[in-house]
């Protein structure tokens, strides 16, 4: 099944835990909302979420590095919009969103390894025993897993994740025959 998604309850707790940590707040909120692979998320620039006129965009569209496809216009939640207003307005539009403490030297985004360490520290702060069940992919899976749980619509998840086919999305979400049978049991005609 791969890495576990972060649950809605865990996200709410984490949002409270990171509210005074700009980098982590932005990673959590934008990571959950945009459902991007870490390579695409970390390479976002301020101009991807803030317009030339200095207003926060309500939707974000990104060209995915792995597939070369452009995502749908993914809506930003109030949490992401507030994080952007709080931490990014006034920054140069061509600067990376996710820069670490040494950014004034490198101007580069944090690495995937740094992001992975942050995710594991989040899970550790929640008291999760085996943090190795979580990774940056857990953040990408979080919203799509919740969408599937609420709608049972794999096609919607496929489109949002930018997968080429439903088989990949089913595997990604960890769906098995037992899940299909459970849905069938719950539908009475």
Regions found by a protein language model. Give the residues of each.
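Conserved catalytic core of the tyrosine transesterase superfamily
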Residues: 1-189
């Amino acid at each position: 099944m791969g890495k576990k998604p972060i649950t809605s309850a865990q996200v709410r707790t984490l949002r409270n835990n990171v509210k005074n940590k700009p980098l982590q707040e932005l990673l959590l909120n934008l990571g959950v909302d945009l459902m991007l692979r870490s390579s695409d998320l970390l390479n976002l620039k301020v101009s991807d979420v803030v317009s030339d006129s200095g207003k926060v965009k309500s939707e974000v569209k990104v060209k995915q590095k792995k597939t070369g496809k452009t995502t749908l216009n993914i809506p930003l939640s109030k949490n992401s919009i507030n994080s952007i207003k709080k931490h990014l307005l006034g920054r140069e539009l061509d600067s990376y969103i996710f820069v670490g403490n040494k950014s004034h030297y490198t101007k580069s985004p944090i690495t995937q390894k740094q992001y992975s360490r942050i995710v594991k520290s989040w899970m550790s702060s929640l008291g999760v025993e085996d943090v190795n069940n979580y990774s940056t992919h857990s953040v990408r899976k979080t919203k799509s897993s919740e969408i599937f749980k609420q709608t049972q619509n794999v096609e919607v998840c496929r489109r949002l994740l930018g997968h080429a086919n439903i088989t990949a999305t089913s595997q990604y979400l960890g769906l098995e025959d037992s899940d299909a049978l459970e849905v069938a049991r719950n539908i009475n005609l």
